[in-house]
Structures are given as C-alpha cells and as structure tokens.
C-alpha cells in the first residue's frame, strides 16, 4: 500500500492524524526534499500532459549481463505454467482465472471491471464496489508470466513460447499507452515490471534476441525500449521520497537501478543507476535492523524487500561496481532472521501484513516456498553453511539466478554440519526464538514478538500484536498468527486481522493495543520493553511488557513471561496486568487449521496429526472455543491474500487485580 492508497481509505478526520504521524517522522532534510519533490512532480505532470519524445536509443551500448547464460537442469513448473498462460489461464493469488491470451490488461480480474484510460496518476481505487480490488489488476500487470514464457523458450527453443512473449508485450504496449490507465498509477508497479522485463530481456538474448528479427521484430524492440524509458522516468518523477517511506521505495529504487544497469542506451540511465544505488545503500540500513528484522514487522514484506535488494545487487555485480559490503551484510542478517523463525517443517510465522507479493517470475516458475529459495540463494552468495542447512537443497530459482556452477558449491556448505538456526535473539527487531531441540524431529519452537508496531509514523503494515507468539512442535504449527485476510475487502475483516484479538496475546476492555485510524494507519502506537532474557541447558525464558493500554482507566501495563522447560518440552506463559484499578481481560489462543482442539476435565487437548499437546488455562474465568465464527470474528486463518479458512480459537475471559498472575501451560504428551 503506497502513501496515496492509504489516504484514499481515510475519512477527513483521520487524515489529520495520518499527516501528523507522517510529519513526526520527517527531518528538516525531508521537508526540503518533499518541497523539491512537489516541484519535480508538478514538472512530471506537465510532461505527462504533453509527453516529450523518447530520446533515440544507442543500440551499440551493451547493458550488464547479470543472469547466467545457460539454462539449469531443474525445470520446476516452468513448462506447466507457460502452457497455462498460453491457454489463457492465469493464477492471480489463489484464483485460476480464464483471462484469455493476451488478456485485457486494463480489466480488473476482480469483478471483471474495465478501467478507463485516463491519467493514471490521478486515478483512485478506494471504491472497490466500482473498480474491484486493484491488487488483482496489479498482479496481472507485473508480467511475471512473461518471465515464465522466456524461461520455457530457453529450455525448449519452441517458437510458440517466443511468439507468446512477443504477443504479450505488443498487446500491453497497445492497451497501456504512457501515461494513461491504471497501470501508470504506481511507481512501485512500474518498477516490478522493469525487473521482470530485464529478466526477460536477458533470457531471450538481449539486443540480439531472435524476438527482434525482421521489420516487425525491430518495431517491437523500438516500442519496448520506448516503454522502458517511460517506465524509468515515471519512477524517477513519482517515487516515494520521505523518511517514512517503506517497502515501495525499495522496490522503486531497485527497478530504477536494474533499468539503468540493463539498458544504458540513454544518458538518463546513468541518473537511474546513481539514484538507485544511493537510495538502496541507504534504505537497506534504514528499513532493516542490524539483527535482520525488517522494520515493517511484516514477514511477507521481509521476503519481498529482500528480493528487491537481491535483484539490484546482482545487477550491480553485473556492471562491475558491486554494492558495499554493508549492503550485503545486512541482506545476510535478514536471512539469518528468517532461518531463526522458520520451524523444522519449513513454516514461517505470518507476522504483520502480507499480500503474497513476489517480485520475479522466476519464483512462480520454480514453485515451492519463496523463503526456502532465498535461504538457498543466500547460502551460496554469502558462503553461509547455516543458511544451506536450513534451506536443505538448491531450488530451481537459485539455479536460474546464480548458475549451475555456483550451485555446485551447495553440498560443500552442507557438509560443514553447521546449525540451521545460527541466531535466536533479534533484540532490535524485538523477536526471540525460544525452545528445545531446534531443527530436530522433536523440535519445540516458540517465536515471541516483543517488537514495535511497525515502520514510520503510520506503521501501515504492522499488526497490534505486542507480546504475541507462535508455537510449533516437531515441525507442525500449533499456535499461529492468523495472517492478513484482505486489504480492500470488508472493513470489519481488515480491522479484525490486524487487531490484537486476532493474535495470541492479552486484550483489555476489548480494545486493540494501538489505536487504529484506518486500513493502513495506526494513530496511537505502543512501546515494548524486554525486561529479562535467560538461556540455559534447562530453561529458555523471556519477560517483556508493553504500554499500549495506558490510555485506559487505571493506566494498565501488560507484562508477559515465557518459560520453556527444555527437558520436558513444555512452556509456561504468565500474564500480569499492572493497573490502579481491576481490569477485565481476555486471552486469545489461535490454533492452526490442522489442529483438532477438544475440551478435557483438566483443560484442552490439541492434536496436529500424531503430535499432541495438553493446555492448562488460568483458573476461574470463562472459556469459549470458536471455529469459523463471524460474531465475534474469531477462528479463522488466512494463508493467502483474500483467502479465509476456518480454524479454532480458544478464548479465556476474566477479571484481574493489580499484578495478579494468569498462568497458562502447554505441554507435549
């Protein structure tokens, strides 16, 4: 969600709060920059209204080659996906849709609404009833499927894949003239298209591709180069520019740099490379903590941002001028965090927002888990045996990115026998891994969240999930983060999935820990503090608290401690509320959709396949077990964007005095 999209979903009153939260994050330099940005955007709008002719491309200039020339042996699902596309079948999020070949690029697959060809930058998409969810249209227009067609051609040499790629490009240029229509409304979307176009350009042979043979081919090349120039200049004119910017800025900078490295045919390409390099070197350190946690506190966007950094980094290596050591070190730290929170079954908690975004078509052609793919790629890039151990094997995408020869070193890394979870504490990001037998068949893994709400003043993609946690046993999820649900669907679902009650934490007075101002806005945040951390052979424990409820009567503070008995595969969770007055509290426990939860005389029995847990809840209080409930909204999990599946939520309600301990015990049996 970009800045403009966030504003579109607010009332006029909450817009005041939004602007205030934005302004709190701005430095003097940011104010000056935004003033200059406003002027440059005004100039860009004037260019859009009367577009300048594209400078003549210097065809004798050769861009950086940053992908291997030889196709790998692993085909993944490339041919299957390529044939689907040629038959008019497109996978948009969880849906397989018959959109035709080529599709109507301005028709939103969600609702089949044909959007007008007006000035893209002035289009608004807040009326989902009229326009559908714009994310579906944007997924289609990222051109990841074009990459799959290029891969299929390189693997087989079959003309139909090359012809299909040509037809998709020609139809897009005809239907989406610069700067008209929804596909010219977002600098981030233009950047993702450029990254995929750069990949396709190399897979099909670059300037000498058979795609460009004959008069028709030369015309296609001219149209493509013209659109590339427009894309890069569009990003340069409309990219995010203030200190509160999040992952869209990283994507925009990555697309700009990749374009400048791949297509140096114009003088402006040097400006694209310079702006991209300087911005990315800054953002990799600003947006990701030194311990590797991306500051949006959203696992899905951690994956997306890492790929932006990766593709720009590979393109920079191709130019012979790589990014700094600090850039690559921060990327390695990001993967060590992913390795830390991934359980023995390969599951990663769904903290914060996720829209299932993938940067590259190489990912959909490979199939499999994008996190595993990144771990394999990182193991080879950094020579990191722990990442290799966690990844387990080289996936097809890594072979396409790094080449078969480079991937041959993977087994050497595995043979070093490194631990698969090199770090368990990520204090700057507020994430801690507790447990026993990590990465073994008997693993008991807890991922505790004592981190901040999110990035910047609005924390657009953070959830109010302070002191929540996940639990997996033997590689099977038990207590989970239910995910995201939807961005633009029914408002009650959006607010529920980002609210505190949809997380494994304690809720006071039925209120969220932070005060929401809209779908992508938190008006009042909380602060978390880690009070104690202990690791020994017998015990793994953490104590933390947050102040999000101090706005309520009695100024309550919630404190939680986790203590894992490493010998008994059990955990005790203790909750306390420190307040001047008694408080009504609710504890929420969200179980995986694969869990069977039953009540017993002593509490609860939870089974996930052959693995069973016993759960003892605090004494007293009222207990309810909800499954797919809409009133209240509980008992749901969202594994994919706009996808809901019933699960089980256990709710405990009661009243507590100042400092009274609520004790919950989970034990493997």
Feature map (PLM): residue ranges:
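Beta-strand-rich N-terminal accessory domains
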Residues: 18, 22-26, 34, 46, ...
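Extended, charge-enriched "interface" segments that sit outside catalytic cores
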Residues: 33-128, 133-140
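Aromatic-lined, polymer-binding surfaces characteristic
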Residues: 115-332, 336-342, 347
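CBM-like, beta-strand-rich accessory domains located in the C-terminal region of large
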Residues: 191, 354-355, 361-367, 371, ...
């Amino acid at each position: 969600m970009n800045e403009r999209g966030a504003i579109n979903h607010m009332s006029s009153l909450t817009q005041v709060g939004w602007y205030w939260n934005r302004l709190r994050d701005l430095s003097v330099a940011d104010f000056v920059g935004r003033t200059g940005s406003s002027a440059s955007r005004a100039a860009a709008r004037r260019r859009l209204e009367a577009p300048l002719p594209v400078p003549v491309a210097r065809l004798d200039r050769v861009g950086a080659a940053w992908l291997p020339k030889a196709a790998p042996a692993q085909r993944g699902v490339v041919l299957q996906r390529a044939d689907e596309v040629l038959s008019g079948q497109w996978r948009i999020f969880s849906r397989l849709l018959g959109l035709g070949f080529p599709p109507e690029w301005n028709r939103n697959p969600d609702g089949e609404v044909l959007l007008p060809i007006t000035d893209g930058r002035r289009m608004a998409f807040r009326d989902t009833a009229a326009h559908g969810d714009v994310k579906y249209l944007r997924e289609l227009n990222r051109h990841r499927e074009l990459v799959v067609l290029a891969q299929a051609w390189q693997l087989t040499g079959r003309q139909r894949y090359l012809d299909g790629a040509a037809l998709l490009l020609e139809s897009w240029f005809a239907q989406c003239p610069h700067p008209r229509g929804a596909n010219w409304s977002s600098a981030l979307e233009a950047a993702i298209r450029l990254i995929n176009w750069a990949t396709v350009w190399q897979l099909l042979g670059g300037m000498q591709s058979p795609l460009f043979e004959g008069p028709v081919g030369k015309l296609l090349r001219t149209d493509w180069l013209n659109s590339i120039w427009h894309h890069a200049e569009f990003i340069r004119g409309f990219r995010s520019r203030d200190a509160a910017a999040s992952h869209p800025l990283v994507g925009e900078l990555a697309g700009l740099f990749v374009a400048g490295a791949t297509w140096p045919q114009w003088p402006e390409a040097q400006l694209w490379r310079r702006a991209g390099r300087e911005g990315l070197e800054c953002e990799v350190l600003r947006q990701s903590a030194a311990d590797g946690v991306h500051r949006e506190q959203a696992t899905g966007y951690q994956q997306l941002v890492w790929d932006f950094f990766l593709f720009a980094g590979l393109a920079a290596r191709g130019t012979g001028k790589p990014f700094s050591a600090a850039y690559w070190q921060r990327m390695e730290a990001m993967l060590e965090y992913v390795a830390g929170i991934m359980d023995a079954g390969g599951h990663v908690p769904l903290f914060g927002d996720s829209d299932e975004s993938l940067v590259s078509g190489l990912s959909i052609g490979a199939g499999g888990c994008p996190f595993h793919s990144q771990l394999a790629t990182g193991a080879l890039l950094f020579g990191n045996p722990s990442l290799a151990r966690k990844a387990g094997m080289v996936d097809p995408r890594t072979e396409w990115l790094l080449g078969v020869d480079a991937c041959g070193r993977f087994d050497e890394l595995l043979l070093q026998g490194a631990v698969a979870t090199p770090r368990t504490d990520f204090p700057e990001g507020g994430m801690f891994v507790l447990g026993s037998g990590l990465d073994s068949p008997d693993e008991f893994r807890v991922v505790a969240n004592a981190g901040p709400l999110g990035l910047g003043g609005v924390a657009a993609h953070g959830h109010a999930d302070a002191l929540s946690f996940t639990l997996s046993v033997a590689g099977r999820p038990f207590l989970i983060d239910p995910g995201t649900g939807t961005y633009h669907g029914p408002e009650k679902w959006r607010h529920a999935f980002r609210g505190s009650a949809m997380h494994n934490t304690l809720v006071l007075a039925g209120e969220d820990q932070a005060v929401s101002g809209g779908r992508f806005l938190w008006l009042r945040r909380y602060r978390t503090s880690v009070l104690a951390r202990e690791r020994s052979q017998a015990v793994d424990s953490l104590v933390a608290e947050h102040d999000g409820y101090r706005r309520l009567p009695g100024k309550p503070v919630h404190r939680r401690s986790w203590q894992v008995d490493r010998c008994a595969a059990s955990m005790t969770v203790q909750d306390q509320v420190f307040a001047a007055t008694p408080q009504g509290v609710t504890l929420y426990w969200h179980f995986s959709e694969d869990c069977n939860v039953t009540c017993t005389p002593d509490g609860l029995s939870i089974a996930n396949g052959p693995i069973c847990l016993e759960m003892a809840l605090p004494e007293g209080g009222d207990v309810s077990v909800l499954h797919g409930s809409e009133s209240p909204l509980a008992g749901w999990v969202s594994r994919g964007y706009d996808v809901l599946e019933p699960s089980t939520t256990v709710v405990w309600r009661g009243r507590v005095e100042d400092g009274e301990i609520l004790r919950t015990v989970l034990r493997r049996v």
